[in-house]
């Protein structure tokens, strides 16, 4: 028996396997599972294929802290980390359990918001599980920090050594074009519908002017009078 396996009993391994399966369903990468679950790599590879039905993807983990400073990513990252911090500090959840529950709640909130607003439901949430996990690690390592907005009092993600002494969150100082891309797809669909209606109206006007009637709908056949 290996040293890693000897440190866990069967009950501990079963619990770690359940946590790993939950993380895989949320989109965890294999590197993340190896660090958080402390299970043999071969076991995690088999578990990933069993849960997802495909082989685990390869590639480097995201390592940029600047990504979290863009306005949309910062809002989502701040929302997730507030949930995570509540589960850790107030609810007393262990780190791995808090990570799973926090991301699940964040994803549910994000899906509910996208259904309530005219947003593109086919697009993924800005903050995937890997970036959420890296956010927790960055904050724990002191690379990123939590600040309080001087206007609304909300806690948000910022640089550890930010130059602003009185920071303001992104929600209180949204950029001018914030949200334009989010509603672009519904707007394009509405524009296409308006264009089609204008074309149908032109067809009807031409039909009346030429002394003919239009039947069978907007794109129906013309019958001379």
From Swiss-Prot:
Database matches in InterPro entries: FlhC (IPR007944)
Cofactor: Zn(2+)
Disulfide bridges in this chain: none
Amino-acid positions noted as binding Zn(2+) in the UniProt annotation, renumbered to this chain: 149, 152, 169, 172
SUPFAM superfamilies: FlhC-like
Chief subcellular location: cytoplasm
Similarity field: Belongs to the FlhC family.
Protein name per its UniProtKB record: Flagellar transcriptional regulator FlhC
UniProt organism field: Burkholderia lata (strain ATCC 17760 / DSM 23089 / LMG 22485 / NCIMB 9086 / R18194 / 383)
Name of the gene encoding the protein in the UniProt record: flhC
């Amino acid at each position: 028996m290996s040293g890693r396996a000897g440190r866990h009993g069967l009950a501990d391994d079963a619990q770690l396997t359940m946590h790993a399966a939950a993380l895989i369903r949320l989109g965890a990468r294999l590197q993340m599972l190896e660090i958080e679950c402390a299970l043999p790599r071969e076991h995690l590879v088999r578990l990933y294929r069993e849960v997802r039905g495909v082989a685990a993807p390869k590639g480097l983990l995201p390592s940029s802290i600047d990504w979290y400073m863009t306005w949309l990513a910062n809002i989502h990252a701040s929302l997730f980390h507030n949930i995570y911090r509540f589960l850790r500090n107030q609810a007393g959840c262990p780190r791995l359990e808090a990570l799973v529950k926090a991301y699940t709640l964040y994803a549910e909130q994000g899906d509910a918001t996208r259904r309530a607003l005219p947003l593109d439901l086919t697009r993924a949430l800005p903050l995937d599980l890997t970036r959420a996990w890296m956010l927790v690690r960055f904050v724990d390592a002191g690379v990123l920090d939590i600040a309080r907005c001087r206007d609304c009092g909300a806690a948000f993600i910022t640089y550890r050594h930010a130059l602003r002494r009185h920071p303001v969150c992104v929600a209180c100082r949204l950029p001018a074009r914030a949200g334009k891309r989010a509603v672009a797809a519904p707007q394009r669909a509405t524009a296409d519908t308006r264009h089609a209606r204008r074309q149908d109206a032109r067809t009807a006007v031409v039909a009346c002017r030429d002394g003919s009637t239009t039947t069978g709908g907007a794109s129906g056949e013309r019958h001379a009078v």
